[in-house]
Amino acid sequence: MRHGVLAGLAGLAAICIAVPAQAAPGRLVIAGGAVASTNAQVHCAFVAGLGPADRVAVIPSASGEASAAAQSYVQTLAAHGVSPDRIDVVHLAVVDDPSTPALDEAGWAGNATAPAEIAKVERAAAIWFTGGDQVRTTAALLRPDGGPTPMLLALRARHSAGATIGGTSAGAAVMTETMIARGDSLAALSQPLIASDASQSTMDGGALMLAPGLGFLPLGLVDQHFDRKARLGRLARALAELAPAQRIGFGVDEDTALVVDLAQGVATAAGAGGVAVLDARGARSAMRADRFSAAGLWLSRLAPGDRLSLADLAITAAPGRTRIDPGGGYYSHAAQSGAGMALPSEGLADALGVDLLDNRVSARLERISFDAAGAGVRYVFEETPDSWAALGGGQYTINAVAFSITPVRVTVTEAP
């Protein structure tokens, strides 16, 4: 087989090398969840530029086990060179941590107005949001009227002054002005949106819910656990609800981060997976009889080390990757269009790489998904003259694949 397997991060976590702070303040480290404690690329990106006396704040507001989640990340930071005595846990949560029976973390719900907790934010050079449920974080940091609490104002002031803001999973979802709060792809494409104050039992299933975020990233939407939870469809549906100029989505894989340098106008992928970039600014979409369709979407993917210009979404592949232009692929096989557990599992990167751009005989790829009632969607990915891929380290960079979504009805009958 031509392509090697991506080497995983192994062994003890590396100590991050301290470097002088750059002249580009206010970076964002937006992690897709399930970040390994040994993932030096992600954790070192978060602490990059910290001086020996600089402090870090950890905000566990999204977690259902706030104290445990905070202490876990304190240990991770310590493994990457940040002494625990330089780390402040911000007491902000909305549910009790059952692992600490002597402490009721639900009592921290109002601490976004507490001077002692706000002071932890004000002295931090880097601030991290743990994972959990993003609605918990916004419930704690936004007032009932949607305005910012004093702690959120302090967070925005620190970010403007150069502090790094990072977060994983739910901590990534809150980064934008509008955030994805609930839903899965198939339901998002076949059911109407639900109100941001509606009750829904799970974050990962059901109809799409959008809600106000915290607004650190002034562009588009972020989705996380992206490839493993098949969230391309829900991201496309969510983007259709934004103003046209804002319709840029970033889908961050697990154990991976998008590192955004707002001052320089660039973003870089770091970690074990990739970051999908979905451009829907020129897309045409419709919702008819609760079925979503869209055409004119453009899909790209950053592999680790790739850089993205935020101004024009141009991708610069990391050094050492081999470029693959249309018609120049290694493979020559008919791509399968089915899905399900009887077929080999294939992520987005391999579908767009092995089956499309790195495949000399394929310029179009279809994938169909459907539920038990037969309501389904067809994804169509097409190579264009602007498309190219790059391969290195077992990872594909993908540039400018045309993408469309069409509702379908599927009937399944037993063979005679």
Residue ranges of predicted features:
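Bacterial N-terminal signal peptides that target proteins for export
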Residues: 1-9
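N-terminal signal peptide c-region/cleavage motif recognized by signal peptidases
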Residues: 18-20
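Acidic/glycine-enriched edge-of-secondary-structure segments
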Residues: 23-37, 93-106
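C-terminal and late-domain segments of enzyme folds
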Residues: 24-54, 58-59, 63-72, 77-82, ...
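Functional beta-strand-loop-alpha-helix junction segments that form "active/interaction loops"
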Residues: 63-64, 72, 84-117
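Catalytic-core regions built around general acid/base machinery
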Residues: 116, 120, 147-162
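Catalytic nucleophile loop
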Residues: 128-131, 154-155, 159-179
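Glycine/threonine-rich flexible loop motifs
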Residues: 134-148
